[in-house]
A protein has these predicted regions:
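Alpha-helix termini
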Residues: 105-113
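Non-catalytic accessory regions of SAM-dependent methyltransferases
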Residues: 1-40, 44-47
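Conserved SAM-binding motif I beta-strand of class I
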Residues: 140-145
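Conserved small/polar residues in nucleotide/adenosyl-binding loops
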Residues: 150-151
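Conserved SAM-binding loop of SAM-dependent methyltransferases across substrates and taxa
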Residues: 127-137
Length: 151
């Protein structure tokens, strides 16, 4: 099957599963990016068999209700990619607003201080604490969680 045919099939399958058609496009773009395939140049070409198998397996996981972030293994948060799996919650867009609010409060009230401590308790993927520290290196961010292993 061509990239185009597989994309159309995946769109229909995910639409029927209530996941939305856009996830099929995101999956295909990401899987092609990982393999240095220019999707837009290859749309009418047959998809390599190994990629087809991986892509359809990912579509099937989403049909079963697995979120896109878990299927891809990462989620974008505040412009940064964070590893996610079933052990952590996927960061939500609303939480990005929280990071923006904390950074704004820092600018308004604490920017003249040299050592401002921030604690990110139950950090999960680390998205909040790491994003805060990347955006404002003056913050001394401490992240903690109860999970004692990593993947």
């Amino acid at each position: 099957m061509t990239f185009h045919e597989l994309l159309n099939e995946a769109k229909e399958r995910l639409y029927q599963a209530g996941q939305g058609e856009q996830a099929a496009q995101v999956l295909m773009v990401e899987y092609c990016r990982q393999r240095n395939i220019n999707l837009y140049m290859e749309m009418d070409q047959p998809m390599p068999e190994d990629l087809e198998v991986d892509y359809l397996e990912a579509v099937h996981k989403m049909e079963l209700g697995q979120p896109l972030g878990y299927v891809l293994g990462y989620e974008c948060f505040y412009g940064y990619d964070f590893k996610v799996n079933e052990d952590v919650l996927i960061p939500r867009p609303e939480t990005e607003e929280l990071v923006g609010l904390v950074l704004s409060l820092y600018d308004d009230k604490f920017s003249d201080k040299e050592n401002v401590q921030v604690f990110d308790v139950a950090t999960g993927s680390g998205a909040i604490g790491i994003s805060l520290n990347l955006e404002e290196p003056k913050l001394n961010v401490i992240c903690t969680d109860t999970v004692s292993y990593t993947h």
